[in-house]
């Protein structure tokens, strides 16, 4: 999402648990979505290949609807919650702006909070050696941007030369220096394991060793810069304001390429495969089906698909709105809550809603969406994206 299994050889709960690792730990797929290339790619990572075979056999047993069923997706998270809950009073799961990974025994976990700029490492192994904590810290800080499920031990020394992955340029050491090289990463990890380990007690009475690592103050901007080339390319291709694309990404995921929500939505622009993703596949890419999780966890593909959907909203679903600024506000609201709810906010029917929107100023349209849209989440979303858009306009 290890060995192949026959139908019925795993119970439903075990199969869900096996698939959960893939829901929470994505990998990058090859340029072409062919089974041959996927097989070649998977062969490089035996553990993932075994999980993939298990998952596919389970899907054969349940039927294809298991891939898109919200109840089954919720069950994936519930399976992890159950396993982790045996050890942790508070079970943490990945969210759009938070990446959480447990070790295989569920006794250690790492959390990257992309919104607030923090890395939190916890272990129930209170007798862990300093060296073990150092390695846990180093692995977390070196989470790669393309596949966080790959063991860092598989990577060459050259690729592990300092923090070159997801947190590149966002970690400063005890001296206030950017942690760029392997020797500095190692030294900082040792300092943290010696000076910043706290002992806490959970509600269930178990002790936890905890290390809090703050990210740099400009962590959001540093991550944003990583994805700027893809944003600019998608902007040119689909003729969408790059500042709006950046604002959407910032609001949806805080530039976390592995963002996942219970909807389920995936990746930087939080695309729902069975709605927006399917629409883009059919109308823009001229492909059947819908994007896979693998597709949407690829930052370039996610940005292009999300931008293509913004273009669809602008030029197809909301093209009857004459004022470009009014249309932009409606596009923002529709990206979150759908075009139908935008029309509902202005009276229900498409024709009457368009007439009412076109009779208002752009500021009045904004205020109406902020106060009269049927979904509170969308009302707040319009405000957040609007503010983010202003922040990114000078940068693109």
Model features per residue range: what roles?
Residues 239-263, 271-272, 306-307, 331-336, ...:
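Short, functionally critical alpha-helical segments immediately adjacent to catalytic or ligand/cofactor-binding
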Residues 302-352:
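Catalytic and binding regions of secreted/periplasmic enzymes and modules that target cell-wall glycans
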Residues 258-261, 281, 344-348:
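Short, solvent-exposed loop/turn and secondary-structure capping segments
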Residues 291-301:
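A short, structured beta-strand-centered segment in the mid-to-C-terminal lobe
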Residues 262-290, 304-312, 358-360, 385:
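Substrate-binding/active-site groove segments that recognize
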Residues 208-215, 284-293:
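Short glycine/proline-rich turn/loop motifs
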